[in-house]
Amino acid sequence: MSLLTLFPAILSFIAVSVPDEGRDMYDAFVNKLANSFVSVSYEYETEISGVKVVGEGNLFLQGRCYRYDADGLTVCSDSRSIWIADQAAREMVIEPVDESSLAVNPATLLVNLAGAFTVKSTKKAGDGVVIYHLLPAVSFGISECSITLAASGTQGASCAAPVLQKASFITDDGIAFSLVIKSVTFEEPSRSPEFFLPSGTDSDWVVTDLR
């Protein structure tokens, strides 16, 4: 699976076991995330075979549905199926949601909050800012992860919930991936499943439907 397709896991694979320091902010973030339509704009950086790779993307989450776009790759799910579209190649693969695979269906954990991550430790990084070091409770391609949350009103956080500022993770094969969150917005969860479906395809596209 592409590194880019792991990003929703950073938001979704969240355990409820948190050390006392930062617990209230962490719980508030999880609750807001699970009960909102969430929009995230981010920049990412990684290194593959000695080559630095940078890019940016946008992610939308609501319950078990999600859609994100990053450098020509679009991945969508309406909770029943997953669409993976390569805009440059004009190719799309459609697969059924695999309820047993956290990496394929990361948004499932927004509803269930199954403990895919446990919090190993926390560290203050400024007034109202906490770094959470996470370890996977199950195997899904990420060996370790950290997220940085800022309390509302601190260091650029302007919404009513704690804000995800940064995230980083290391895959099982040792590739490090870091993200800087440009913006996060929370709205009422009023989007229909159709909002998350892909658009802009025509008869020139090669579509492989594996459902």
Regions found by a protein language model. Give the residues of each.
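N-terminal leader/targeting segments and the immediate start of mature chains
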Residues: L3, F7-V53, R64, S199-R211
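A generic structural motif
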Residues: E43-E47, D69, A85-Q87, L135-A137, ...
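Surface-exposed, polar helix/loop patches in the mature regions of secreted/periplasmic/lumenal proteins
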Residues: W83-G141
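Gly/Pro-enriched, hydrophobic low-complexity segments
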Residues: G115-F117, S121-S203, T208-D209
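Extracytoplasmic
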Residues: N35-S39, V54, G63, S77-S79, ...
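An acidic-aromatic
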Residues: E56-V104, G174-F177
